[in-house]
Amino acid sequence: MSEETKEEIKNEKVDEEVTEELTEEALEDIVEEEINELDEAQKLATEWENKFLRVSAEMQNVQRRGNEERLQLIKYRSQDLAKKILSSLDNLERALAVEGLTDDVKKGLEMVQESLISALKEEGVEEVSYESFDHNIHMAVQTVPADDEHPADSIVQVFQKGYQLHERLLRPAMVVVAQ
């Protein structure tokens, strides 16, 4: 081989090595760029996933609250009607207390009263307890001194009955309380 041919082969080898080094550096740069882009894409995907999870949880909460409100509306649907019927029930009670009613009239009034009470009970309306004074369900309209027969905080007399629908108070009982 001639000197020139040897020199050409040597130059080709050097060119190949330089090209190989450049290609390796370029590949490393490209790989690094791709890794950075992938990291950004993963961050973006994680961010969108978190947003999706938050929105999904919020939707579940909205549905749950809507269901709870619907159940409350169903549970207390008869509240306004019950409040209006209570005054009629009071009037029936007053009418039954009148002296001189004939037995037929009295029996008719009692039947109407029982019918109203039964209808209210079916809807969940119940009379409040009168065992001892509870400011949550009773309204003290008068107090009397406590004695042996009526200890302190006991209810001496009920002026007007109180009612509740499930656990919600419709009307407090108006009572006389021993102090």
Swiss-Prot record:
<comment type="function">
    <text>Participates actively in the response to hyperosmotic and heat shock by preventing the aggregation of stress-denatured proteins, in association with DnaK and GrpE. It is the nucleotide exchange factor for DnaK and may function as a thermosensor. Unfolded proteins bind initially to DnaJ; upon interaction with the DnaJ-bound protein, DnaK hydrolyzes its bound ATP, resulting in the formation of a stable complex. GrpE releases ADP from DnaK; ATP binding to DnaK triggers the release of the substrate protein, thus completing the reaction cycle.</text>
</comment>
<dbReference type="GO" id="GO:0051082">
    <property type="term" value="F:unfolded protein binding"/>
</dbReference>
<feature type="region of interest" description="Disordered">
    <location>
        <begin position="1"/>
        <end position="20"/>
    </location>
</feature>
<dbReference type="GO" id="GO:0009986">
    <property type="term" value="C:cell surface"/>
</dbReference>
<dbReference type="GO" id="GO:0042803">
    <property type="term" value="F:protein homodimerization activity"/>
</dbReference>
<dbReference type="GO" id="GO:0006457">
    <property type="term" value="P:protein folding"/>
</dbReference>
<dbReference type="GO" id="GO:0051087">
    <property type="term" value="F:protein-folding chaperone binding"/>
</dbReference>
<keyword id="KW-0963">Cytoplasm</keyword>
<keyword id="KW-0143">Chaperone</keyword>
<dbReference type="Pfam" id="PF01025">
    <property type="entry name" value="GrpE"/>
</dbReference>
<dbReference type="GO" id="GO:2001065">
    <property type="term" value="F:mannan binding"/>
</dbReference>
<keyword id="KW-0346">Stress response</keyword>
<dbReference type="GO" id="GO:0000774">
    <property type="term" value="F:adenyl-nucleotide exchange factor activity"/>
</dbReference>
<comment type="similarity">
    <text>Belongs to the GrpE family.</text>
</comment>
<dbReference type="GO" id="GO:0005737">
    <property type="term" value="C:cytoplasm"/>
</dbReference>
<dbReference type="InterPro" id="IPR009012">
    <property type="entry name" value="GrpE_head"/>
</dbReference>
<dbReference type="InterPro" id="IPR013805">
    <property type="entry name" value="GrpE_coiled_coil"/>
</dbReference>
<dbReference type="InterPro" id="IPR000740">
    <property type="entry name" value="GrpE"/>
</dbReference>
<protein>
    <recommendedName>
        <fullName>Protein GrpE</fullName>
    </recommendedName>
</protein>
<comment type="subunit">
    <text>Homodimer.</text>
</comment>
